[in-house]
A protein has these predicted regions:
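Intrinsically disordered, low-complexity terminal tails/loops enriched in metal-binding residues
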Residues: 18-161
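Sec-dependent signal peptide recognition
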Residues: 3-11
Length: 161
C-alpha cells in the first residue's frame, strides 16, 4: 500500500518535472500582446522594438522610452509623446496610462492628481527617444510616483535603468 503511494508520488513528480516550461515569449502572451498593441496605439511606436525604463529616484522618478534601433521618425514620435504626457500629467490627466493598461485606476495616479501642483514633469530628448523626469519635494507625492513607476515597470516588463 505504501509502495503504491510512493509510486504515485514519483509518477506525479516525473510528470511535473517533465512537463513543458512556461512560454516566456512575450508575443505569445495574449494579455501582454494586447498591452503592447494599446501602447503602440497610444505612443505611436512599436513597443517590441522600443525600450521602456521606469526608474524611481529619491525625489520622484523618470519614464524613458527609446527605440532599440536607429529610427529618426520613431524617435521624433517618442519625443512628441513625452511632451504630450508631461503636459497631461501636469494637468492631472492620466487617461493615457489607463488606456494602455486597460484600467481606470493606475496605482499612484489618484494621489498624483490630488498633489499635481506639487509635482513637476519635465520632458527631455534622449538619444533614440526621450524621457519625462518627475520631481516633487512632497514625500506623499514621491511615494505615489514610485507606486506609479513600479506598476508601469511590472506591466511593461521593463527595467529601472
Amino acid at each position: 500500500m505504501i509502495a503504491d503511494g510512493m509510486r504515485a508520488v514519483l509518477a506525479l513528480g516525473l510528470f511535473i518535472g517533465c512537463s513543458r516550461p512556461p512560454n516566456n515569449n512575450a508575443r505569445a502572451d495574449s494579455s501582454f500582446a494586447a498591452l503592447q498593441q494599446r501602447g503602440e496605439t497610444a505612443m505611436g511606436v512599436d513597443q517590441y522594438t522600443s525600450q521602456h525604463i521606469f526608474e524611481p529616484l529619491a525625489d520622484g522618478g523618470r519614464v524613458v522610452l527609446q527605440r532599440k534601433e536607429t529610427d529618426p521618425a520613431g524617435e521624433a514620435t517618442i519625443r512628441a509623446h513625452m511632451r504630450t504626457i508631461a503636459a497631461a500629467f501636469s494637468r492631472g490627466d492620466f487617461a493615457l496610462p489607463g488606456f494602455v493598461h486597460a484600467t481606470s485606476e493606475v496605482p499612484g495616479t489618484e494621489t498624483m492628481k490630488r498633489l499635481r501642483s506639487e509635482i513637476t514633469y519635465s520632458p527631455r530628448d534622449l538619444p533614440g527617444g526621450g524621457e519625462v523626469v518627475i520631481y516633487s519635494k512632497n514625500p506623499e507625492a514621491v511615494t505615489a510616483i514610485h507606486e506609479f513607476l513600479a506598476f508601469q515597470r511590472m506591466d511593461h516588463r521593463a527595467g529601472m535603468h
